[in-house]
Curated annotation (Swiss-Prot):
Binding positions (S-adenosyl-L-methionine): 47, 73-75, 94, 125, 143
Key word S-adenosyl-L-methionine present: yes
Entry protein name: Protein N-lysine methyltransferase METTL21A
Pfam families for the chain: Methyltransf_16
Biological source species: Danio rerio
Signal sequence annotation: none
Localization per record: Cytoplasm
EC class (word): transferase
Record keywords, A-Z: Cytoplasm, Methyltransferase, S-adenosyl-L-methionine, Transferase
Chain's role: Protein-lysine methyltransferase that selectively trimethylates residues in heat shock protein 70 (HSP70) family members.
Amino acid sequence: MALVPYDENVLPALSKLHQSSAEFTLANHRIRLSQDWKRLGVAAVVWDAAVVLCMFLEMGKVDLKGKRVIELGAGTGLVGIVAALLGANVTITDREPALEFLTANVHENIPQGRQKAVQVSELTWGENLDLYPQGGYDLILGADIVYLEETFPALLQTLEHLSSGDTVVLLSCRIRYERDERFLTELRQRFSVQEVHYDSQRDIHVYRAVKNKSNTEL
């Protein structure tokens, strides 16, 4: 996973990434997440895209009660945690190095009565997808997972595998570079995509995608 070096004195707003924890009030709960930039880098801090996606879920425009939800590239687990607090049955995934850290955040923030509704699992995009049910989810969530162009083919393959014709994909991201636009172009070749929310303060877009009928496995 790539790290982008920066001078903390030049970009003081990014100093929050080096804090050992981050706190939020979402889904009527106080959520406290551990962060560990030095050990795990970008996977272990809360990015604006995750916060915006959580706020979008709070709006109630997506029915989460009892739904089968999977989060990709979960990092700190914020989005999956909020989805679970809003009533979903959630599989929260990331690569193996982040799992211990991710699991601790989940256990810390999910009430005992909801623990069985949440599963933390290893998922490297494009690998061992047969471990996950093909088209087996109502909702796929991803926050700030569109940034490394070399991962785009595997991410698209994973989205296709996990999606049925009824699955909704919600991706929250900042469009930084031409490569981000290229990903959206490739996504639109396989999914029907529309922007459903934009946070102008944070410059974060939320996209809704549903697999094109011609690409739905029979």
